[in-house]
């Protein structure tokens, strides 16, 4: 960016924060494009509080993706329905957009066995003990946008009866905790593969979330064998 600022190079790729901090000498044109970088909320499916997919889905339903895109990324991002670039040829219209739905989230939480306690926080009885839906969101403190994203998600969850809080970590601590599975929720960012292979994210052989699903593994394997674009899309939709 400093070289671009000094007009020593003609082209630079940057995020929104850099472009608001550095202005090149002379005229410059800015062209927006959708990259393969995906920011996401990661769940630790190994822990009791997040082992039920209905709980995870409820949390997802509470997130206002459009608000994050508009107010944190200054509309220089696009809310994705799933882990595929919205501009990719593989993208398809689900019709069911992922919009914030507090009522739907509440129904899912109750279906999963959670009930609001006297303080309005969801909890349940498990093995004779009270399990409270108190969740830590860890985030790398080096990224202002991801910190703000974590804080907005925290606020949305708190409003809905989930006692969420944010812990800002150094890059070293953050990577250590995510890599060792020492987290509940985390704000992550990854670059999706050009061939749209989602194995690193959801394959049972190894992912950060402890997620395992034999049916998903079968679909991922099929993605690697089919060649026609129509067949690949059909497997992806499955």
Where in the sequence are the language-model features?
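Small-molecule pocket liners
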Residues: 37-42, 82, 87, 207
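A local structural motif
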Residues: 1, 131-137, 155-169
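Ligand-binding "clamshell"
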Residues: 20-32, 180-183, 195-207
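Extracytoplasmic/peripheral linker and loop segments enriched in polar/acidic and small residues
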Residues: 69, 107, 159, 163-174, ...
């Amino acid at each position: 960016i400093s070289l671009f600022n000094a007009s020593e190079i003609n082209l630079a790729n940057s995020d929104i924060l850099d472009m608001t901090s550095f202005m090149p000498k002379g005229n410059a044109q800015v062209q927006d494009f959708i990259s393969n970088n995906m920011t996401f909320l990661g769940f630790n499916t190994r822990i009791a509080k997040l082992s039920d997919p209905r709980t995870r889905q409820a949390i997802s339903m509470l997130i206002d993706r459009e608000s994050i895109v508009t107010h944190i990324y200054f509309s220089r991002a696009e809310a994705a329905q799933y882990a595929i670039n919205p501009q990719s040829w593989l993208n398809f219209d689900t019709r069911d957009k992922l919009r914030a739905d507090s009522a739907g989230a509440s129904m899912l939480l109750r279906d999963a066995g959670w009930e609001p306690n006297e303080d309005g926080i969801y909890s349940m009885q498990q093995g004779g003990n009270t399990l409270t839906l108190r969740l830590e969101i860890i985030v790398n403190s080096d990224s202002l946008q991801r910190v703000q994203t974590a804080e907005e998600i925290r606020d949305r969850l708190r409003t809905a009866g989930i006692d969420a809080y944010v812990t800002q970590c150094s890059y070293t601590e953050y990577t250590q905790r995510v890599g060792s599975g020492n987290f509940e929720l985390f704000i992550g960012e990854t670059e999706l593969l050009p061939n749209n292979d989602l194995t690193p994210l959801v394959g049972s052989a190894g992912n950060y979330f402890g997620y395992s699903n034999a049916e998903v593994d079968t679909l991922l394997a099929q993605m690697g064998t089919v060649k026609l674009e129509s067949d690949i899309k059909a497997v992806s939709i499955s």
